[in-house]
Amino acid sequence: MSYETISIEKQGAVDWLTLNRPESLNAITTKMVTELRDYFGSLYENESVRIVVMRGAGRAFCAGLDIKEGSARKNEGDYVPFGGGMGFQGYLAEVYIRMRRCPQPIVSLIHGPACGGGFSFVLASDIRIAGESARMNAAFIKIGLSACDMGSSYFLPRLVGTSIASELMLTGKFIHAPRALACGLVSEVVPGVELVNAAKPYIADMLRTSPMGLRLTKEGLSMAIDAGGLEAAMAIENRNQLMCSRTNDAKEGMRAFLEKREPVYTGS
């Protein structure tokens, strides 16, 4: 499908996904959700894309839900997605599930506000780099809702610990770039104009890995976080490592190491 609220720029094996409603600080609309569901859903079967970089156009990463659209929908009886019986709530929630399910690592470049559902885009990513202007919050609680929404209660405690997650979610206060770096929420903080350049070393390092090795590392991490214990986590590791070890790329990686050269992976 063609997209109106997001844009995809393909650079080799890397997709640069831009939330593209700058006039509304990239606020989330039903159309944006439809497009994000389509895009992230398609990645599961897309072998040519190895990495996704997610960012926002204009002054913000994503200001969260477009409240104006939501109010209009309620007042005018506009179409509401089924969302598994949960309406728009379930419809949007599926985006974050697809972000975690897709085998491609997602790198988020955050500048300006990332609020509510926009904050959850950040949390559902695999690597986060913040511009100096970045500020993030679980904004739901500020508008009479629970802060536990769109995966935030799952992701945030795992990233920063229960204590900081409780503080941020119970108050709705912003966490700014310096503190986000200090508590491990982001990998680094750079001037906003340097965000793209800051992402390039991460991208280059990941592109030097084998395609299957990269995919199964994301999958293994996601599964191990929820594993019942060490043995369950190691069972996942053993399964994935056995699969990787039987590929031609694994043989090439070992040959290249012994021959002191860069490996040439073919994805086989």
What residue spans do the PLM features occupy?
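Short, charged, surface-exposed hinge/linker loops at domain edges
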Residues: 221-227
